[in-house]
């Protein structure tokens, strides 16, 4: 629905990271991803986060939101704040 004015964005994560607190806050289990070379974390500031393997998947998800796209810096900030909340 183009009527959704929320913002959406993505963040590339390379390799495998052991920060399970941060990844749990984003609503997925990083271990399941088997530490592939690149994971794209995608979503809005307030909705559950999604982990995809390609940026195209993320673009498809973000198409539903008409707000300006989050920068990677902003996405990183969301990640840190959510990790604190669930930590």
From Swiss-Prot:
Main location: cytoplasm
Family matches, as SUPFAM superfamilies: BPTI-like
Disulfide bonds: 8-62, 16-42, 35-58
GO molecular function, one term: toxin activity
Domain of life: Eukaryota
Location within or outside the cell: Cytoplasmic vesicle, Secretory vesicle; Secreted
UniProt note on tissues of expression: Expressed in salivary glands.
PTM summary: The N-terminus is blocked.
Keywords: Cytoplasmic vesicle, Disulfide bond, Hemostasis impairing toxin, Platelet aggregation inhibiting toxin, Protease inhibitor, Secreted, Serine protease inhibitor, Toxin
One Gene Ontology cellular component: extracellular region
Keyword presence, Secreted: yes
Location of the BPTI/Kunitz inhibitor domain: 8-62
InterPro entries the UniProt entry points to: Kunitz_BPTI_sf (IPR036880)
Motif Cell attachment site in this chain: 17-19
Keyword Protein biosynthesis found: no
Other information: The monogrins comprise about 4% of the total salivary gland protein.
Reported function: Tick salivary platelet aggregation inhibitor that plays an important part in the anti-hemostatic strategy of ticks. Inhibits platelet aggregation induced by ADP (IC(50)~150 nM), collagen, and platelet activating factor (PAF). Acts by binding to platelet membrane glycoprotein IIb-IIIa (ITGA2B/ITGB3) in a metal ion dependent manner. Does not inhibit aggregation induced by ristocecin, an agonist that aggregates platelets independently from the glycoprotein IIb-IIIa (ITGA2B/ITGB3).
Protein name per the record: Monogrin 1
Originating species: Argas monolakensis (Mono lake bird tick)
């Amino acid at each position: 629905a183009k009527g959704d004015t929320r913002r959406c964005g993505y963040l590339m994560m390379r390799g495998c990271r052991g920060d399970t607190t941060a990844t749990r806050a984003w609503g997925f289990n990083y271990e399941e991803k088997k530490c592939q070379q690149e994971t794209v974390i995608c979503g809005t500031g307030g909705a559950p986060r999604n982990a995809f393997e390609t940026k195209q998947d993320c673009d498809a998800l973000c198409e539903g939101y008409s707000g300006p796209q989050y920068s990677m810096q902003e996405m990183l900030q969301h990640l840190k704040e959510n990790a604190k909340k669930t930590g």
